[in-house]
Structures are given as C-alpha cells and as structure tokens.
C-alpha cells in the first residue's frame, strides 16, 4: 500500500483547531468533516466543497460552545449522518441524496453521559460508546436506545470489522471488548478480548487481526482471540510521539496509524500471516493527526490534523491501464477499482474472503470482468454492476470464458462446463462436455415469467456430438436426454425452457417438447433458424421459403412465404418483428404478424381473455384454427369455461360448445346462489369429467353427492347400460328389474342378438342364449356355451343344430371339438381333417384310430408344405417315415444341417442325389470343408476343385487334385488353366495357379509380357529377392528407352539409383524433373548442382533468372569458381553480381598459383585488388625481385615486410650481415636485436641496441643478467662485484637470487649477507622488505633464533616473538615481550594457551587457564578430573560443572550417579539448576522395582538432598516461591518412599507400608500414576484390604489402557469422587510395569469381579470421608498428613515443633516400638530425619492418654 498526496481539502490554521472527526459515505459520493467550531463540511468525491451545516446543542439555552462533536458516521444508504456530542446526545441529520437538500434532524438520542465514539454498521442500528463506559445501540426506526454491554471505564475508541457485523470498543483502562451482531459462523468469542498496556485510542480491526496503539509508542497486533501476534516498538525512537488514531482499509488488509507528523502503514501478508510495515509517510509540520477516514472503495484516505487541516491521499498498491480503455487501481490485495476511462463509471471488485487478486481482465466486448485469486474466481458485469465470487481451485489460467449470454458466464475448463450467474456467489451448475461452442449450449434463466413458476433455470448441452442433455439447474436433475442419428450443429431452448430446437449437420431442424419427451422433425433442410425474442414463435428458412411457426405446440401448422435470398437477422423492436433477408446487393425486411406473436405471449402469460380478444380479430385459417385449439385446451385446463365454449364454437364443434353452454348455465346459477365461479360444484366437475371422457370420475363426483339417478341418467344417455345396471345393483335401486327389461327390449329392438344372448346367459337362460347366438350367426359362441354346460350337451337337438351351423360356417375344428365331447369320434376326426386341425386329429387318432396316425402325419406334413411351413413339416415327415420328403422339406426350408443329418442317416443310395445340392449351399456360404466332404461323397470331385478354384483357394484345390491326379497332370492342368486365365485377362487368378504349381517364373514372364511391371516386381520381391534392385534398374532402362520417363524414374528410385534418374532427365533436357528428384532424393547439395548444370546449359540472362528463382545465384557463382569454371562464373557475375568479380579473380589467381602459372596469377591477384597476395606468393617462392617490383608498384606498405622476410631467410642461412642490412633498411632494429638474442649473439644485440635504440639498453642489460644461466658461483661472483662497486641494492638482489637446495650453509650465508648489506647500506623500508623475504626463509630452515635476531635488528618485535613461538622458544618469546614490548605479553600467553590446548596438555593448561582446562575436561568426558579440579576452585565454578556432569548423566540414564554427586557436593539453590533437580526426581521415581527394602538407601539419599535443597531455598530469594513449594512436595514424596522402604523390611510395619503407598496416590501429579496405583493396589492386597486393592488395581488397568491409547480422557473417576486423589494427571510416556505383571493383575481383577465378594467402595472414617483423604467431603476442612503414614491426623495426634507437622499417635507409637524391638538402622534413620525435618521428636516412649 502506497500513500500519495493528492490535495488539501481544508487549509490548516496557525494554532490548535483540531479536526474532531471525519466520515466517508458508503456510496463513496460524499465526505463529511467536522471542525473544532462544530460545523460539518460536506465534500464531493473529488474533494470539492459542496455543502455545510452547523450542529446544534442538546439544549439551546446552553449555547454552542458547551459541547464538542466526538464522532460521526453516515447511514448505510448515505442519506443521513449521525453526530455524537459531549453534551450527552446523538443527533441524526437527514441530508438527502442531492447537494443542497434541506438538512433535517430526523432522530435524537439523549444519553446519561457524554457520547465519545460512534459507528453505524447496519440500516437502523447505531452503536456508540459513553464516557461512563457503556456501549449502547440506538434504533433509528423506533428512536429508542438500549445498552448492549457496560463497563466501568471510559470508551476511548470504537470500530467495526470489515463486514460491519462485529464491534470492538477500547476503554481507558486498556480493555478491548468484542461484540457481534452476527458472528457469521466464525465461532469467535464475545466479551472482554484483551487488555492493552495503555488506553487504546488507536484501534483498528483488520481481516485477520486487531491493531491497537496508544501513548506508549507501541503498536501491537492481536490475534482473533486476543493473543499477541506482533509488536512494533518505537519507544526508543525520539522522533516518534504517541499514536492518536488508526483506520483500517475497507478490505481490512491495510491499516494506517497516525501520530505526530507521521502516518505508519501496515499491510497484511496472507502468505506469512503477519503485518509488514511499509516505509512511513513523514510530513513535516503536519502536527498531530486527530482523525482518519478511509473511502469505502479503498482508493482515498483522508487525514485530519490538530491545526484543522484536512489532507487527501491516494491509496493504492499499484495502478495500471488496461487496453487503453480501463484504469485498474489495486487499493488492497483483495480489492481493485476498475474505471472506464471513456465514461468514468467505476466498479469495485473485491474478494469477500480476503483472498489476493492476481490479475483483472476485461473481456466479452469490454463488458465483463474476470479475476483470479488463489481459491476463488471473481466475475462481474460492468453494465448491470452485478458481481460474483465463486470457489475456484487453481487451473493454471487455462479456462475459456464465454459471454454470449447476458445473465450467465460460461466457463469451460478441462472438459467441464461451469455456469455462474452474475450477482450470485455460487456456481449455478456444472456438467461434463467436450463441446464448448455457444451454439451447442443453451442457458435460460428466468427470461420470461410463467404462472406458478418461481425459479426457472434450464440448460441444454451436448454430452457427445449426437446426444443432447437438458438439465434443471435449480433442482440439479436431468429433464431429458435426446439421442440423435446425426451430428448436431446448433441448439437453443425457448425462453421458458419448455421446448428445444436443434439442427443437425444434414441441416434437418427438430423440435423437442421437454414435458412430453416428444421429438418431431420440422424441416428437412434449414440453413437459418431462430426463436423470436419474447415469444415462442420460431422463424426458419427452408430453401426458397421463410417458415414461421406462430403456435409451436402444433409443429405441423407452419406459415410460409417465398423468398429469394438468405435470412441474415431477426429484429424485434417498437412492437414490430422483422426478418432481414439478404437478396444479393439489397437487404429486404419481412414483417411478421405481431398479433399471432402476441397470441403466443398472452397464452404463456395465462391471459386467456386477451388471447380470445385477439383471435376474434382474425379470419379463420389453418394457423388461427390451431390457435383456437390451443386456447380451448388451455382454457379447459384452467377451468375458464366461457372461453372454452367460445373456442369450440369458433372451431365449429357444436356438440362440445352446446355441452359447455349447459355446463356454464349450471355454474352461473351456482355462482349466483353461493358466490364463487361455480366450477367447484359437483355437477360442473362431473360434466367436465364427461367432456374429458373420464366417466368413472364423473360417476365418482355424482356418487359423492349420492346423486344415483343422475349417474344412471348419464349412463343411459350414453347407452352404457352395463355401467348403469352396475350402479343400480350397487345401490339396490328399486327400478333395477325394469332397467334390465328395458335394456333387453332395447337390445332386441336394435337387433343386438349377441348382447341379448349375453344377457340371457348372465340370467341363466342357456337355451335362450344358444338360440340367440345362433340367430346372431355366432355358432362358435353357442358351441363354447354348450361345451361348458352339460345340460345343453345332453340335448341331441341343440348339439345337432349347433354342429350343423358350425359345418355350414366351416368352423370344422369347433364342430370336431363338439363331436369329440359327444363321443362321436369318427365325425370328430373327419371335421378335424377338414378343418386342418391335425394336432387334435393326431391326438384323437392315437386314442381312437392308431392305424391312422402315420397317414395323418404325412397329410399334416403335406398341408404344412402347402402352407409354405417347410420347417414345421420336416418332423411330421420323419414321424411318417417319409425321409425323401423330409430331406426335400429341409432343403426347401433351408434347414441344411437338418437335411444333411437326415441324409447321412439314409442307407439307400437314391438319396445321394441330394449331396450335390447341399454341397452347393455350403460352397455358397464358404463352408468349403463341409462342401468338399459332400462333393466327394456325392462323387463330384471336379465340382469341389472348381469350387476351390473359384474361391481362389488354389492350395486346397491343388491338394484335392493331387489326391485324384498325378503331379504332371496337375501341373499341366494348372498351367494350361493359368494360360487360359491369362488370355481372359484374369492375371491374378493365373498368377495364383502358376505359384500353386511352383512356376513363379511363368507368372513373372506373363506380367513382363503384358508390361504389368508392378506385379512383376512384386513377384520378384517374393521369389527372387536378390535380383530385385537389378530388375528395377533393368526395367527403368527399358522404360527410358521407350521414353516412359515417369515410370522409369519410379524404378530408378526403387533401385536406389536416383543419379541415373537425374541423368535420364538431364539428357532429355527435362531439367525441372531432374531438379525435383535431386532435391527430394539427393543430399543437401545435389539439387544445387542440378540447378547449376541447368543454368549452365541455358547460359546468359536465362541462367541468371533461373538461379535467382531458386535463390542459388551466389551459390552457383561460388560453385563455378570453386570448380574452376571461371568463364561461366565471370559471365554470371558480370550479368548480375558485379561485386563478386574480384572474388572470382582471386579464386582464379589461387588456381593459377597452384598450377605454377605465377605471372598469370600475379595479374589475377592485382585484378582482384589483392596485390599483397601476389607479393606473398613471390615471397613464398623466394622470388624477391618480383616481390619487390609488385610491392613498389601496387603495395608500398609491403616493401618493409619483404625486407623483413628476406632478412629472416638470410638469418636462417647464417648470412647475418645481409640480414642486418635488410632489417636496418626496413627500419626494424628491434627485430635485429631479437634475432641476435635468439641466436645467443648478445654482443651484436648490445651493439645494435647501443647504436639504434640506446633508451632500451639498460632493459637489455637486465634481461641479459636475468637470462644468463650463470650458476650459483657466477651469481655469487656477480653479487660480490656489485658489492665492490657500491651497487648494494643489486648485490642484495643477487644474493637473494641464490637458490641451491643441495648446499644449505651456502644459502644461509648468502641470505644473511643480503640482510646484513640491507641493514647497513639500504633504507629502513628496503631493509624491512629484505627481512620479510629472508626471515620466513630462515624459519623454513628452522633457524628460528637467527630469524628472530634479524627481526630484532630492525625493531620488528612481534615478528621476532612469532619466530620464537614458531620454534616453541616460549621463555625467549616472553622475555622479549616483557623487555621490549609489554603489550605483547598477553598475546604470548594467549598463543601459549592455544598451544597447550592444541597439544592436549590439559594439566599444564590448568596452571594457565583453569576454566579453559575445565571445559576441555568436560569436552573429553574426563568428568572426575573436571570435578576434582573444579572443587579446588570456588563453589559456583564447581556447581557449574556438576550441573553439566549431571545433565550428561541424566541423558546417559545414570540418574543414581547424579544423586550421589549432589550427596557429595551439596545442592545450591540456583534457579538454573531447578530443572536438573526436577529431572533427577522424575527419573528416580520412574525407576522400576524400587518398591522394596533394598531401595532404602536411594530414597533416603533423595530425601536428604531435597531437604538440604529446601533449607537452602528458605535462605535464598526463592523462598516461598512456586518452585520452593514444588520441591517441598517432592521432599514429602521422597520421605514417604524412604519410610515405606524402611517399613518394608519389618513385618509388623506392613500396614504402615501399605498406608504410605496409598497416601502417595494424592501425589500422582508428580509420580507416575500407573506405578502409584499398581504399588498401592499390591500393598492393599498384601494386608488384606481387598476393597481398596480391587479399586486401585482396576484403576491401574484403566491407566495402562489409556497409556496405550495416548490419552486418559476416557477414564471414569466415579470411584474417586470426594477424595483428594487428582483426576487430571500427566499421561506417562510408557507403562512402568511389565506386560506379564499387568496380565496377572487383569486376571486377579476379573476373578474378584466375577466372585462379587468385594464391594467396589473405598472405606470411610468418622468424617464420612474416604479414610486416606486429607480433605473432608462434607466440610472441606483439610487435615494434616501423618509424617509416618501420610493418612489424615484427626483426634489422637502428636505435634512437632515445626508448624504443620504432626503424626497419628497410634502409627507413631507402632513405628517407635518396631524400631526399638528390631534395632532397624533404616527405621532409626527415618526417626533421625523426622527430628531434623520436623524440629525435634516428642518425648520418647508410648503415649496411652
């Protein structure tokens, strides 16, 4: 967050005139400032002063200067301002929405003390604080106020959280209290939150924490529950003053704190979870800041000062311009203001959850906002200002957004479509789809309201390219799935989401009704389709027609207009709908019938009167008729019967219109009598049910009212006599018989004999029924009735009449049934045969005429064949034994398997003829093996071979042929057949035959002869692979000879000889083809070579054009030159690239040089502008004269180089004089010197140098000296010479250069001589430099004394001391330091200590540095030496190392050694040792198997150490501290353990030992609980206290289970209620008892609980309390514990000198007696300890009082 000064709103005054308060309006349009003179000034958004008003006192009589305005706030709607005043009142002023509106006081709230602060978080609730400490709420609706909470401390500040649902109040005593109007599910606490170190005048509530500051110059950040997160301390900064005010940004992620001349800015870092301080805004002469107010969009901060100034600052993290259209101002991590630069409109985009906004984009024709945070996605509509924030997990920014729909944003990501409705913070719905085209998705959200539908949100999309799914987004369920047979390319729901239009790739248009799930095709060809906005009318184009469906419920009703062009658009505005058609250049509009569209809309809106009125204006047409039908249906459903009557009248449905007219009369009469519309009357409801043909429902309505006659009348009118009679029967109607008679008469009158017969049958008149059935021409029914009634069968007359009628009517089967029932089997069989009822005939024959069965089966088979039921006939022929017929039937029925099965069962050869037919079938279905078998069986082997041949299965044919023919015959047959096929042009078949008889060469020859080279090559590849390439080349050459170049090319390439193909085309001047092949198949440069040859063949301009076309001109020139075709290269260069000519000359010159044509080469070099190359050529050939000539003529600069080259040559030839002359001519004396030096001719070099370069003589001399390989003697001689001539510096250098490792004495002598000369004759600095060289060399040779002496001669004291130290001459080093530079004594000592440490001479180190020595002992683990040495030092040093040793021992698990260490050396009351003492105690009480007499010494030592510690603590500053009390408790526990060990050794004290174990249970906060209960249980069990043993051991088992689980939360404390045994104890890290012992205890506890002999209750004493509890359950009085048993001391007590120490007389006497009788040293030790601890024993002896 950066604060940037914008402008001064109110100029500061010279003196104090503070701005008391300020407030920004929630709508960001107004800013209010209250000055010291109690005037409220109003500014606009830009900071321009627009209005002002004066505040009023609570009582006018007190005047205007009797109060101060402390705080003010705008109402949430920005039309009111609440003003808090110190004269105990709050005024609410209505300021209006416009500037200059009259200011009116609309509320006032009088209080009992001054109002100090105020906020207005919600519509009618103002929260304010009072000087008396109360925080109250004022309701502007009721003008009443009430107290929310009260404190006793002045309210200094009040603030709300970001949402305004939570309030913080700061009080003068430092208290900060929190109150929630609504905690928004956070679960945070209310009430006192924290206490700050000073009054929290600066109080701000950020998103994640609370910032508090005040006069102590500290800014503290507190967490959500008042814990300190961070502290910013400026108390040491003298420039800082007290903090007076704080303000949080609207997002809560930045907080500004004001002080003197300074604003401190803090920004919340979500990643770190802390506040980061930005660089403070320092403004000299601003003085103390008294008020801060942040604009609600976060973009401005206003600052009020002590001198009455108001400054405005711009607040932003960053600002950017997007697409030069929008300004993005990031006012916080989670808030961005987006401003349209052209219109000035603004939208505040904010993350409601406080997430950091990454980047904001404006998309969808600059109308929609999209932004990401880490966990959410922000969307917004800039036009409607609807914003959304939905949960969105990071997808790497790969989403695609579609904004085609104005109400919903479609987001496509990784195959999933999500829909977000603008203004909603939830994802509307998401579905899986791969098709993210707006034309393949349709969303409709409440676009047209329907009757009775609140929320209508539908989605249609593609599941796959042929399947549409329709989803209800409100309920989240599938409304339907449409599977289509073709790909779908467009779909759209209507505005109500009830109909779906879709079009497929074949341009067929379909309509799907979602409610009925009916799909109908509307057009077979449709390039354009669209719903008319605001209606259910569809407009589409079908080739040359404009199609309009005004009533979509009747898709067949379509209005068509011819048109010439294509529909391009549909426009609906100003009550007019036009279809725009593009007819070539012109656009023509076709106006739709708005009235028809109006009808559809009226229907959808449920306004049927409006629809009727509209239809009455239209003439009757197909469309109008469809609309009347729709209206009639809907009005009936809505029970608007008058409209329905009008509709049926219009449709000409007179009967329905009359029926409805009568119904309406009934309804009107009812309505007149009873009010309402009369449609609920039973007659109306019944008539409507009749109209709907639901007669049962109508009957129900009548019967509910017991209107039986009306039901009967209804059924009679409808001639539904059966139903009428049923009603009469059900109700026992008196007219029932008459009704039946009337019904029969009616039937007879209307000649309904069948129905009359049924009535007779129902009445039991079967003879009459039979007569009537016969009369009605229904003999079959008469027969059924006769067969069901035996009395009719007994009448011969009736049976003969019925059978005669049946035979006459050709109902033979029924006649047969009747004859069979009357035992007339012969007639029955005849009838069955006549009626073709063969099954019944056969069944009857099996019983009555067995001989006829076989005949009947054959006849049955013949009948079935006649009926073409061949399949059914087969079995009957088999039954009749007619196999041939059966085979023929099976073949006719194409039951080939059955036919084959029957055939194979035949032994007779007459059936063999059928093999061929069946075999031919199997051959036709390509079941060749079966067919072959049948052909062979039927002696048709030739047919089998032909079958295989035709099927191309030559191998099988061959195999078959071989079986019945010789190999030669087969081959002759196959070859001759193949040749025939060849003649017929069936080459493939011929090939198959050739290859079958192993004659592939014949096939190859055949293909070659017929020039079928592909097939020829294929066979060669299979049968002669080694000849394949050769064949390709051979064919290619043949084809080339025939000028079939393309085919030849193919074979050359297949033969891997692309060069031959290129050459073929080149020879035939087909350069394009040659170039193509070279480029495709040649290497990287092949095509370039072909292009080059092509160009060369063309020559001149044509060549240049060609090469330019391929971009190879320069390459070609280079290639020509490189291949020595210089004429062509020059030709190309001259025509197109003159700049290349010199290069070609140069290459030509090089070529000529290589050819030895030097003169021609020289000319070419000069033409190339490279005379130097010509010179170098002559120089290379040692042709110095020509070189000189060319150089002088063309390159004078090279003359000198020639002379140098000539000189070099002469030097090599040892002609030194010539060489020198040449070099001096070339003016290169330095080269002469170099060559002489290289030749070792130093004299000549010196001479030349002296004559021509005297300035370099000295350097040469030095070089000569350094380079001269003189040897050691030569060096020394030279040095002595320098010395004699007084050149001491050179002499020194010479001596120092001497390096002869074989003669160390000589070396030493030389170096010492150098040092001596330096000291004597050279300057001090030079001498020091020499000593710095010689000294280290001497030290290296271990000549420490000589080195030190050298340093001392030059007063280099420290170097001398270092030399002595290097040689471990410590005494000399100390002496030098002491005598020459006492400051270095400490340095020597330090080095000496380091030396001792490094050498490990600790014993020597003790004398020098004890602490260092002790540390070293400790490091090495030499603890005995360490402690022994430390004991000779002071007490503190000793205990420091004892503490270190103790810590080491505890880590190693040797805690008993720690105890003996403190026994030996005492326990000082050092607080830093407390943890060691506690750890020692814990480790000792955790030890296993210490519940015995043998452990007495350990426990007594622990007890004595703790006693000594407590005594030392009493004398120290830690007396009576919590630590002291804790050690007293440990002492008591250790005493109990020691006493218990003593008692364990004596049988008569077993009860004392048990009591001590039980008393230790109250100390389970210090000792392991499981161990304590285990030991107490065993002790109680040992002395027979089974109740206690059971309870304690049971508790032990519960604890053990808890330790295994890691928690003791599940423990039941019932047994220990009203005892002093603690419930809350630490969970031991491990079990202190072995698994075996634990299982033993578990078995004992189970046994006891099963026996039920022990009551699970702890024993109680006279107090009614558990006997070992110190605290009485009823009174809460705490008794003293007995020093012997730990049990409470009640009546018989012995008191000791030390207060609070007592014993039970009985226990004391018992212990004393046992001690005396046994002389136990342990018991005596206990008594001695009690004397020491409790201040003396009472007089010895028994007490019997």
From Swiss-Prot:
TPR repeats lie at residues 691-725, 750-784, 809-842, 854-887, 912-945, 947-971, 972-1004, 1042-1075, 1272-1305, 1328-1361, 1407-1441. One of its GO terms (cellular component) is ciliary basal body. Disruption phenotype: Fishes display cysts in the glomerular-tubular region of the kidney similar to cystic kidney disease. Knockdown of the gene with 2 morpholino oligonucleotides leads to ventral body-axis curvature, formation of kidney cysts, otolith defects, and hydrocephalus, as well as cartilage defects of the craniofacial skeleton. Knockdown of the gene in a rhodopsin-GFP transgenic line demonstrates that the level of rhodopsin-GFP is lower in ift172 morphants than controls, suggesting retinal degeneration. Its main location: other. It comes from the Eukaryota. It is found in: Cell projection, Cilium. WD repeats lie at residues 14-53, 64-103, 110-148, 150-190, 195-233, 238-278, 284-323, 483-521, 522-559, 680-725. InterPro entries: TPR_IF140/IFT172/WDR19, TPR_IFT80_172_dom, WD40/YVTN_repeat-like_dom_sf, WD40_repeat_dom_sf, WD40_rpt. SUPFAM superfamilies: Tricorn protease domain 2 (SSF69322), WD40 repeat-like (SSF50978). Pfam families: TPR_IF140-IFT172, TPR_IFT80_172, WD40. The keyword Repeat applies. Keywords: Cell projection, Cilium, Developmental protein, Repeat, TPR repeat, WD repeat. GO terms for biological process: cilium assembly; intraciliary transport; photoreceptor cell maintenance; pronephros development; regulation of TOR signaling; retina development in camera-type eye. Required for the maintenance and formation of cilia. Belongs to the IFT172 family. This is Intraflagellar transport protein 172 homolog.
């Amino acid at each position: 967050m950066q604060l940037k000064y914008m402008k001064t709103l109110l100029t500061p005054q010279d003196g104090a005139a503070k701005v008391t308060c300020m407030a920004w309006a929630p709508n960001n349009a107004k800013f209010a400032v209250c000055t010291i003179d109690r005037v409220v000034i109003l500014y606009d958004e830009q900071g321009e002063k627009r209005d002002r008003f004066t505040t009023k006192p609570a009582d006018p009589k007190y005047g205007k200067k009797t109060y101060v305005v402390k705080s003010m706030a705008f109402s949430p709607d920005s039309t009111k301002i609440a003003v808090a005043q110190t004269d105990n009142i709050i005024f609410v002023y209505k300021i209006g929405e416009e500037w200059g509106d009259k200011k009116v006081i609309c509320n006032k709230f009088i209080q009992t003390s001054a109002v100090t602060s105020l906020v207005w978080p919600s519509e009618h609730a103002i929260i304010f604080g009072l000087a008396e400490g109360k925080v109250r709420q004022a309701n502007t609706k009721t003008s009443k106020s009430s107290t929310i909470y009260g404190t006793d401390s002045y309210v200094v500040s009040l603030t709300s959280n970001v949402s305004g649902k939570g309030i913080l109040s700061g009080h003068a005593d430092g208290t900060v209290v929190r109150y929630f109007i609504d905690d928004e599910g956070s679960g945070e606490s209310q009430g006192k939150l924290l206490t700050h170190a000073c009054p929290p005048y600066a109080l701000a509530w950020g998103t994640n924490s609370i910032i508090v500051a005040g006069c102590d110059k500290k800014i503290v950040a507190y967490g959500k529950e008042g814990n300190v997160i961070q502290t910013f301390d400026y108390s040491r900064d003298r420039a800082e003053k007290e903090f007076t005010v704080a303000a949080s940004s609207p997002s809560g992620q930045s907080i500004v704190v004001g002080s003197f001349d300074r604003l401190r800015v803090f920004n919340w870092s979500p990643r770190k979870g802390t506040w980061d301080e930005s660089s403070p805004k320092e403004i000299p002469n601003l003085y103390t800041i008294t008020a801060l107010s942040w604009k609600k969009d976060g973009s401005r901060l206003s600052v009020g000062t002590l001198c009455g100034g108001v400054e405005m600052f711009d607040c932003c993290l960053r600002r950017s311009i997007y697409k030069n259209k929008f300004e993005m101002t990031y006012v916080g991590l989670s808030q961005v203001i987006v401003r349209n630069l052209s219109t000035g409109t603004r939208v505040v985009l904010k993350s409601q959850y406080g997430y950091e906004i990454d980047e904001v984009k404006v998309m969808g024709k600059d109308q929609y906002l999209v932004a990401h945070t880490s966990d959410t996605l922000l969307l917004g509509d800039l036009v409607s200002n609807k914003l959304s924030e939905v949960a969105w997990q990071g997808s790497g920014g790969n989403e695609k957004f579609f904004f085609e729909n104005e109400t919903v944003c479609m987001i496509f990501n990784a195959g999933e479509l999500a829909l977000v409705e603008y203004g909603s913070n939830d994802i509307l719905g998401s579905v899986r789809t791969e098709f993210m085209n707006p034309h393949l998705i349709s969303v409709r959200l409440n676009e047209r309201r329907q009757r009775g539908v609140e929320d209508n949100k539908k989605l249609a999309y593609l599941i796959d390219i042929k399947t549409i799914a329709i989803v209800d987004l409100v309920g989240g369920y599938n409304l339907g799935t449409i599977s289509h047979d073709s790909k779908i390319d467009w779909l759209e729901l209507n505005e109500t989401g009830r109909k779906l239009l879709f079009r497929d790739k074949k341009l067929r248009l379909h309509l799907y009704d979602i409610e009925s799930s009916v799909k109908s095709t509307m057009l077979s060809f449709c390039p354009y389709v669209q719903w008319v906005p605001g209606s259910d009318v569809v407009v589409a184009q079908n080739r040359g027609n404009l199609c309009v469906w005004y009533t979509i419920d009747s898709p067949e009703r379509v209005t068509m207009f011819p048109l010439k062009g294509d529909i391009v658009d549909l426009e609906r505005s100003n009550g007019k709908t036009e279809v725009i058609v593009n007819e070539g250049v012109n656009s023509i509009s076709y106006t739709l019938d708005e009235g028809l569209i109006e009808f559809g809309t009226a229907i959808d809106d449920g306004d049927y009167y409006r629809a009727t009125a509209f239809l009455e204006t239209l003439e009757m047409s197909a469309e109008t008729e469809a609309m009347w039908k729709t209206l009639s249906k809907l009005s009936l459903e809505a029970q608007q019967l008058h409209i329905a009557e009008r509709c049926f009248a219009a449709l000409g449905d007179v009967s329905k219109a009359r029926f409805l007219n009568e119904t309406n009369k009934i309804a009107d009469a009812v309505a007149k009598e009873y009010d309402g519309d009369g449609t609920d009357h039973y007659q109306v409801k019944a008539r409507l049910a009749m109209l709907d043909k639901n007669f049962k429902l109508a009957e129900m309505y009548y019967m509910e009212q017991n209107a039986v006659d009306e039901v009967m009348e209804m059924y009679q009118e409808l001639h539904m006599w059966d139903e009428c009679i049923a009603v009469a029967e059900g109700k026992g109607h008196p007219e029932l018989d008459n009704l039946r008679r009337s019904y029969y008469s009616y039937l007879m009158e209307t000649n309904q004999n069948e129905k009359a017969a049924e009535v007779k049958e129902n009445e039991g008149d079967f003879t009459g029924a039979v007569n009537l059935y016969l009369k009605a021409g229904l003999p079959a029914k008469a027969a059924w009735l006769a067969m069901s009634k035996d009395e009719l069968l007994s009448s011969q007359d009736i049976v003969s009449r019925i059978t005669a009628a049946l035979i006459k009517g050709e109902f033979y089967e029924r006649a047969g049934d009747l004859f069979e029932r009357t035992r007339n089997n012969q007639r029955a069989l005849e009838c069955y045969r006549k009626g073709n009822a063969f099954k019944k005939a056969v069944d009857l024959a099996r019983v009555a005429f067995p001989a006829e069965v076989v005949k009947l089966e054959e006849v049955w088979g013949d009948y079935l064949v006649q009926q073409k039921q061949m399949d059914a006939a087969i079995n009957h022929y088999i039954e009749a034994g007619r196999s041939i017929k059966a085979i023929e039937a099976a073949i006719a029925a194409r039951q080939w398997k059955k036919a084959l099965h029957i055939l194979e069962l035949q032994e007779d050869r007459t059936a063999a003829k059928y093999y061929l037919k069946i075999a031919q079938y199997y051959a036709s279905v390509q079941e060749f093996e079966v067919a072959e078998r049948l052909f062979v069986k039927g002696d048709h082997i030739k047919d089998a071979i032909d079958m295989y041949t035709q099927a191309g299965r030559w191998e099988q044919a061959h195999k078959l042929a071989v079986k019945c023919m010789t190999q030669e015959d087969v081959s002759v047959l196959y070859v001759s057949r193949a040749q025939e096929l060849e003649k017929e042009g069936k080459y493939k078949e011929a090939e198959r035959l050739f290859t079958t008889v192993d004659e592939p060469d014949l096939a190859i020859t055949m293909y070659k002869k017929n020039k079928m080279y592909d097939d020829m090559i294929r066979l060669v590849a299979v049968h002669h692979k080694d000849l394949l390439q050769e064949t390709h080349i051979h064919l290619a050459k043949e084809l080339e000879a025939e000028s079939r170049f393309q085919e030849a090319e193919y074979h050359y390439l297949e033969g891997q000889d692309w060069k031959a193909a290129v050459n073929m085309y080149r020879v035939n001047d087909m350069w394009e083809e040659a170039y193509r092949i070279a480029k495709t198949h040649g290497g990287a440069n092949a095509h370039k070579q072909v292009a080059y040859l092509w160009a060369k063949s063309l020559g001149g301009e044509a060549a240049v054009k060609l090469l330019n076309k391929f971009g190879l001109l320069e390459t070609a020139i280079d290639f020509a030159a490189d291949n020595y075709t210089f004429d062509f290269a020059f030709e190309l260069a001259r025509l197109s690239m003159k700049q290349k000519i010199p290069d070609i000359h140069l290459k030509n010159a090089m070529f000529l040089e290589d050819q030895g044509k030097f003169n021609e080469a020289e000319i070419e070099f000069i033409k190339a502008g490279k005379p130097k190359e010509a010179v170098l050529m002559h120089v290379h050939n040692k042709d110095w004269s020509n070189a000189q000539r060319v150089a002088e003529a063309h390159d004078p600069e090279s003359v000198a180089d020639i002379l140098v080259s000539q000189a070099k040559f002469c030097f090599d030839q040892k002609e030194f004089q010539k060489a020198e002359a040449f070099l001096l001519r070339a003016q290169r004396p330095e080269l002469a010197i170099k060559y002489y030096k290289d030749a070792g001719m130093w004299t000549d070099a010196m001479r030349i140098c002296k004559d021509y370069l005297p300035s370099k003589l000295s350097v040469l001399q030095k070089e000569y000296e350094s380079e001269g390989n003189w040897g050691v003697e030569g060096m020394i001689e030279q040095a002595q010479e320098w010395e004699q001539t007084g050149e001491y510096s050179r002499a020194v250098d010479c001596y120092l250069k001497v390096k002869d490792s074989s003669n160390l004495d000589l070396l030493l002598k030389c170096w010492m001589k150098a040092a001596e000369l330096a000291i004597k004759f050279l300057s001090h600095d030079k001498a020091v430099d020499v000593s710095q060289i010689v000294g280290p060399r001497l030290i290296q040779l271990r000549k420490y004394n000589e080195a030190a002496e050298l340093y001392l001669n030059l007063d280099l004291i420290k170097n001398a001391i270092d030399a002595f130290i290097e040689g471990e001459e410590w005494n000399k080093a100390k002496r030098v330091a002491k005598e020459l530079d006492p400051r270095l004594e400490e340095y020597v000592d330090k080095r000496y200590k380091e030396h001792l440490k490094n050498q490990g001479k600790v014993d020597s180190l003790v004398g020098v540095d004890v602490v260092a020595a002790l540390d070293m002992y400790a490091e090495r683990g030499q603890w005995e030496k360490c402690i022994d040495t430390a004991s000779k030092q002071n007490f503190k040093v000793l205990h420091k190392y004892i503490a270190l040793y103790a810590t080491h021992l505890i880590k190693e698990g040797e805690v008993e050694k720690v105890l003996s260490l403190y026994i030996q050396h005492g326990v000082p009351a050092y607080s830093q040792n407390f943890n060691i003492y506690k750890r020692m105690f814990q480790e000792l009480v955790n030890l296993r198997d210490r519940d015995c007499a043998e452990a007495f010494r350990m426990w007594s030592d622990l007890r004595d150490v703790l006693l000594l510690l407590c005594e030392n603590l009493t004398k120290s500053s830690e007396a009576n501290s919590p630590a002291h009390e804790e050690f007293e408790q440990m002492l008591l526990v250790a005493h109990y353990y020691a006493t218990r060990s003593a008692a364990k050794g004596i049988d008569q004290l077993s009860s004392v030992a048990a009591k001590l174990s039980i008393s230790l249970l109250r100390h389970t906060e210090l000792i392991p609980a499981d161990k304590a209960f285990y030991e107490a249980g065993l002790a109680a069990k040992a002395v027979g206290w089974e109740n206690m043993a059971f309870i304690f051991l049971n508790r032990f088992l519960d604890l053990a289970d808890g330790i295994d689980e890691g928690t003791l939360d599940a423990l039941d404390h019932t047994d220990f209620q009203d005892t002093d045994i603690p419930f809350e104890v630490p969970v031991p890290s491990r079990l202190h008892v072995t698994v075996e012992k634990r299982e033993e205890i578990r078995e004992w506890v189970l046994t006891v609980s099963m026996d039920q002999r022990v009551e699970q209750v702890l024993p109680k004493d006279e107090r009614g309390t558990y006997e070992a509890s110190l605290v009485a359950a009823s009174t809460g009085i705490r008794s003293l514990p007995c020093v012997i048993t730990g049990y409470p001391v009640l009546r018989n007590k012995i008191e000791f000198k030390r207060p609070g120490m007592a014993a039970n007389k009985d226990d004391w006497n018992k212990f004393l007696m046992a001690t005396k009788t046994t002389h136990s040293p342990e018991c005596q030790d206990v008594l001695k300890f009690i004397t020491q601890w409790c201040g003396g024993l009472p007089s010895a002896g028994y007490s019997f009082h």
